[in-house]
Amino acid sequence: MAKFKYKTQMYQNLYANIKNIYSECAQAAKEIGIADELVKLKEEGRGTFGLTGGVSGCPAPLRDDVLAFSEKEAKSVKGLAGYVEEIRYMVKDFYGSDYDACPVNTCEAGINVCYTSMFMPPVMGAGDTYRARYIAPYEKHFHHQGGYGRPFPPKYKDIIANRGCTAGELGMQGKRQPMLDVLVTKLEGADYSNHGIQYFPATMLSGVKGEANRAVFEEQAARHATMFSGITSIGYDTPGYGYGDKDADGTPILQKVLADVAHKYDVPYVVDAAWCLPFVGHDIRKTGADAIVYSLDKASASSICGMIIGKEDIMVNARRAMGFHGNRYGSLSSYGKAVSVAFDPGKEGLCGAIAAMRVLKDKPEIMTKPVDAMYDIIVEEFKKGIAPELLKGFTFTKTYGSCACEINYEHTWDNGQMGIPIFSIEDMYGGTNIFQEGIGAMGMIPTIAYDGNIYVSTGLNTLDDTGALIPERMRLAIRGLIALINITCKYAGIMD
């Protein structure tokens, strides 16, 4: 395959050969044994399998314990406020009495509740409403945590324009809150080079150091002090997400820095931890965050439900917004009839959350043990399947906090050389992310694989009904991923 002078030429050639790549992927699936495994799963009525845990558009099968509790409670007549209270006291048992909980129907709903009740300026009262601005690092998944304000500076006005299935007011634009701006803040040590078939800036963050960014956020906060209302970030803990620089306790230093800056100005620091586990992952006590939002149907293996956990004082805002904080006549708990009542999770979501959180709190090894086995399979298969000169640019990071293994290949581009193709998140939404669509061509469910970072996790029929890893099936999935990388590299001109 021809070598290319410019990376734009490489991505153009990939696009021109996309059908050939997917055809070779389908053939590889047969040779590896993926196709045969898919036949077995379909005969069992279990659909397909994949490289990820449950996602919004494809929830994971429920474990036996979650399913059993949900089925039992489905036949019980109880007020939903009682379930909310049980969740509340699990959180207090683990984090301490100064913390509280607020269940919601999805993680995105939780972010909406937090930003509306904690970042957005008040809209009641005579006269004009003032503007407020929250700080968001320019990092991965920015369209979630960074999508609720008008971007500042204006050069970022289209930063999330191509990140959604629906354009305009009912798509990403519709998340923007009244009189709220988002301060897009580049990270020191990050690489925002353009990549992908859609050729947008990628967020490559393995070089980010926590303390090196303190001055960046201090300056941003000081510059906008009169309108500064909060800080947000994601809650992951791996190098590819910019949080590989940690203290002696394993806490990402950048998250502690963000908390310090927020508290200096007496504004909240809210963490989007969609793919993290409460009790196991991001520890709000160590980072200093004020509130953290989870998607329990992802890594936590619950039915569809979101969860806000935070410090009691700021959680009054969220719980009142959801109608959980008690009736006006003095009750200690209630359910619904507040501004964000449309975000309530319902009985099925609450029961799944309770069952999943019990395991995370009391038997976390059920969730973490499969991660060890998955990591070993990934490292073993990549050593066998990826050319040594390319493998030098990979890093593999295991994270219990997300039940995942991060496969980062940013450094295959070191020293000015052409590396393994990097696809942007715009490629994902545009259907041109070959590292995701190619897995689909093999018949499997892909995982997020953009910005030089592939996040493999357990869940989509790679665990049995008790939550134990099915190693043979996970190995097939990883071999499929490696085959896809090699096929793509051939058409990228970086290997024969």
Annotate each predicted stretch with a short phrase.
Residues D36-L38, E43-T52, A126, P151-F152, ...:
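Short secondary-structure transition/capping segments
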Residues A2-K19, S23-E24, D376-G493:
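Conserved C-terminal alpha-helix-loop-beta "cap" of PLP-dependent enzymes
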Residues A2, K7, Y11, V77, ...:
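Conserved PLP-enzyme active-site core in the AAT-like
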Residues K40-E44, S70-S76, G230, G288-D290, ...:
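Short N-terminal helix-initiation segments at or just after the protein's N-terminus
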Residues A26-K42, G57-V66, P201-T203, D266-A273, ...:
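Short charge-dense sequence patches
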Residues A60-P61, S333-G419:
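Structural motif of enzymes handling amino- and sulfur-group chemistry
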